[in-house]
Amino acid sequence: MSKRLTKAEKAAQAEAAMIAAQNAELAAQADEALNADEAQAVEALAVETEANEAQADEAQPVVLSAEELRAKAEAAQTLLLESVQVRIDNAPSANFAKNMLAELNALSGRNALIAIEKCVELEVDFESLATAYAIADDKAHDYVAIYAAQKIRKSLFALATGMTSVFDGYTRSIMQNLVSLHSLSNRGSQRALSRAIVFDEAMQTEAVRAYKDCAPSTASTQASSTRQAMRFLNVCNVAKSKKDDAMTFTESKAAQKLQAMFNA
């Protein structure tokens, strides 16, 4: 009798191992579009959220209940995914479609939902963001280019987890300077990414530090997409002027959170 029981136990263990391996494979596929810091941060965020949900019944009343907050996050996630799918369906090239599909996968599932929920609390306007995502005309003012889409997604996870390492390196360098200087011109944003960009005497007013060092052409593209991403997330305002654009922080909770992250 004991011999048959041992075989049954072994069979059960083998089945459990197989299920665990399958689950691990699915988890790896879901995290494929995330970098290592992003995946680690999201995993910690999921654990924290589960603990908070377990204590929800004992928590003090809030303006928005946990159920209402989750419902808003689910609606926001649905809007985002629908808009990204529009871009995939209208992709100008196979490579663009591939990149947007990676964004679709990264914004899907429970981990992304948790990050979106955190950003709903930070006053990110997901309806406006989804509307912009759906624009397929690359000449439109609110068109979201692929670099900006990637930065928006990374920034959502960074704000949700409170980890500056989750921002892409270009955005991180620009934000480090903006937090220090409180206002940053377009030229200053590029200087934060490339030491090859030199100010003329009239523009030598910003003590900008280049935490990244790339080609000037790359700096221009990356600075532009970072400004766009921060504007869509209601983190920064961009004031236009004849001399140069200037980026400043908004009064939103997302902007306050970002500044606190870089000042920590």
Residue ranges and their predicted role:
Residues 196-220:
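Short helix-coil junctions and helix-kink-helix linkers
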Residues 240-246:
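Short, Lys/Arg-rich nucleic-acid/phosphate-binding segment
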Residues 69-183:
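Long, low-complexity, charged/polar intrinsically disordered regions in eukaryotic proteins
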Residues 7-64:
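N-terminal intrinsically disordered, low-complexity tails
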Residues 179-189, 193-195:
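Short, amphipathic alpha-helical interface elements at domain boundaries
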Residues 214-232:
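Short amphipathic alpha-helical interaction segments
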Residues 250-264:
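Short, amphipathic alpha-helical interaction segments positioned at domain boundaries
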